[in-house]
Swiss-Prot record:
Its cofactor is [4Fe-4S] cluster. The keyword Metal-binding applies. The active site is at residue 292. The gene is bchB. One of its GO terms (biological process) is photosynthesis, dark reaction. InterPro entries: ChlB/BchB/BchZ, LI-POR_suB-like_C, Nase/OxRdtase_comp1, P-CP_red_C, Protochl_reductB, Protochlorophyllide_Rdtase. [4Fe-4S] cluster binds at residue 36. This is Light-independent protochlorophyllide reductase subunit B. Protochlorophyllide reductase is composed of three subunits; BchL, BchN and BchB. Forms a heterotetramer of two BchB and two BchN subunits. It is an enzyme of class 1 (oxidoreductase). One of its GO terms (molecular function) is oxidoreductase activity, acting on the CH-CH group of donors, iron-sulfur protein as acceptor. Belongs to the ChlB/BchB/BchZ family. Component of the dark-operative protochlorophyllide reductase (DPOR) that uses Mg-ATP and reduced ferredoxin to reduce ring D of protochlorophyllide (Pchlide) to form chlorophyllide a (Chlide). This reaction is light-independent. The NB-protein (BchN-BchB) is the catalytic component of the complex.
């Protein structure tokens, strides 16, 4: 039944499609029924490139199964003739895996000249992230060859992939910083790399692996087989970026000295990293001390997403913006231990590890934080409870695959994130001001469904006069209620004076107080008593 709801990770063959669509000269062929051809649709809708997805579905139908025929050989011949790829990756979807067919034998019947790589994975145990990591690691093992080191300091950027969260802008940000340092980019993989690029991966001095989800297996293989060094930190935020740059310079100089290469890299003035070469590379340090951002200090934030962004956003929000983290979690069970280790001392309670978006929605509704950083699922959940939310992790929707330059990494990324935090929360403050002072003629959407409860409908069989009398009479406690209390007009009016971003929680607290203390009707006095019971003035 889980597939009837939103899921955080795609299927295994979706992950395979992401790798195939990232690599030049590579084409994926999925042995799958018609319903499993959604990979092409997802890439066509979300990937902002002029190219069609590098994937084809070899459709399996009920008639084919009944007649004992197989379309895969014909599909392979068509793909070779039309796309002329250097490599074809063949994989079965979760549905056709149940047929337990010998793909090697079927592929052999195609008699094509193009090299075919069959990637078999158990789709019932492996999902998108693990499948993508496994395939990319396998391809690096297959194609990487011994190379002489480049004469000048160089790095590989390993991990960016098709449909990754802001990866195109992240790569641009990393390229800008490397150009400032005078460091060459040897290969970016898998995003935009070809098979020839995979072969020359060992020519770089250092591997940079900014994402926890993709690239670790490939980097570890390059370390074991070719003795390469790697950096696995994520330069998200000012402090992590500074630390990352200094470590990068230190490692490259050490590798150069070890291999007899000329390398005397030094940290340039920070202004060199800015767009104009004269100003600070990021406005975050001074902006956090401005009057506007001071109001964010100790605001409560909740973070959920993949491993990389959950860790990085928690640290950025607390360490650089001064926000209080009221909770965090990830949907990647295999990376949960790493996330816990990285966030030791940052969280008020245990890390949430779940693939059920309903659990996160309930937690958000219970905590009512000032800001949520999550996936598109959290964006939908927050909209229902009127909590400000910014999307900082996959899964995403089309509005998170932008044409402009919106990195998450580096100095540029710090500015983008700070802007998003500010505008996301600032709009919430604006709505509160409109609620408080009036809309001045603005057509601001009001929650029309939250009408003031009519006293006449308070309880079954109660007359309008009795209900009105109950609404205006002084609040008197009684035995705990078994039913739900009724809101009087003055109680509703007082509730609307409470800022919208804590209004729902205040309403729940008031109703709980009323039931526990026997108030059948919630008047303004009951709202005040609730506030006093919770320590409010």
């Amino acid at each position: 039944m889980r597939l009837a709801y939103w899921i955080y990770e795609g299927t295994a063959h979706h992950g395979i499609g992401r790798i195939a669509n990232s690599l030049k000269g590579v084409h994926a062929v999925f042995h799958a029924p018609l319903g499993d051809d959604y990979v092409n649709v997802i890439h066509t809708m979300l990937e902002r490139t002029p190219n069609f997805p590098r994937a084809t579905t070899s459709v399996v139908t009920g008639r084919d199964l009944a007649q004992g025929t197989n379309r895969l050989p014909d599909t392979l011949r068509q793909v070779e003739e039309r796309f002329k790829p250097e490599l074809i990756i063949v994989s079965a979807s979760c549905s056709t895996t149940l047929l337990q067919e010998n793909l090697q034998l079927i592929v052999g019947n195609a008699n094509i000249d193009t090299e075919v790589f069959i990637y078999e994975v158990n789709p019932f145990r492996v999902q998108e992230t693990e499948a993508a990591e496994g395939l990319f690691t396998a391809l690096v093992k297959k194609y990487a060859e011994k190379q002489d080191l480049t004469e000048e300091p160089s790095i590989n950027i390993i991990g960016p992939a098709s449909l990754g969260f802001h990866v195109r802008s992240d790569v641009t940000s990393l390229r800008r910083m490397m150009a400032t340092l005078g460091v060459k980019i040897n290969v970016v993989a898998p995003y935009s790399a070809g098979l020839a690029d995979l072969k020359k991966l060992p020519a770089a001095w250092l591997n940079v692996v900014p994402y926890q989800e993709l690239g670790h297996g490939a980097a570890e293989h390059l370390e074991e087989k070719f003795g390469m060094s790697s950096m696995y930190d994520t330069p998200l935020g000012i402090q992590p970026t500074m630390k990352w740059l200094n470590e990068l310079i230190e490692k490259l100089n050490a590798i150069g000295a070890k291999n007899g290469k000329s390398s005397n890299l030094k940290m340039p003035p920070l202004t060199a990293f800015s767009f104009d070469g004269m100003s600070a590379p990021s406005g975050v340090p001074w902006f956090t001390h401005s009057a506007d951002m001071e109001s964010f200090s100790m605001k409560r934030a909740f973070v959920f997403g993949d491993a990389t962004r959950t860790v990085a956003m928690v640290k950025f929000l607390r360490d650089e913006l001064g926000m209080e983290i009221c909770g965090a979690g990830t949907y990647l069970h295999k990376h949960a231990a790493w996330v816990r280790e990285q966030l030791a001392g940052y969280l008020p309670d245990d890390l949430i590890v779940t693939e059920e978006f309903q659990e996160i929605a309930k937690r958000i509704e219970a905590d009512m934080p000032d800001l949520v950083c999550g996936t598109q699922m959290e964006r939908h959940s927050c909209r229902k409870v009127d909590v400000p939310c910014m999307v900082t992790s996959a899964p995403t929707h089309i509005e998170n695959h932008l044409l402009g330059y919106y990195p998450m990494l580096g100095f540029d990324g710090a500015d983008v994130i700070a802007d998003r935090v500010y505008t996301t929360s600032k709009l919430g403050l604006e709505k509160h001001l409109i609620d408080f002072f009036g809309d001045a003629g603005l057509e601001y959407e009001e929650e029309q469904q939250e009408k003031v409860a009519e006293p006449a409908l308070a309880t079954a069989g109660e007359t309008a006069g009795q209900a009105t009398e109950a609404a205006t009479a002084p609040a008197t406690p009684g035995a705990p209620l078994t039913g739900e209390p009724v809101w009087a007009a003055d109680g509703e009016a007082m509730l609307k004076k409470i800022p919208f971003f804590v209004r729902k929680k205040a309403k729940l607290n008031t109703e709980t107080f009323a039931k526990e203390n026997g108030y059948a009707t919630i008047t303004a006095e009951v709202v005040r008593l609730t506030k006093e019971s919770l320590g409010g003035g």
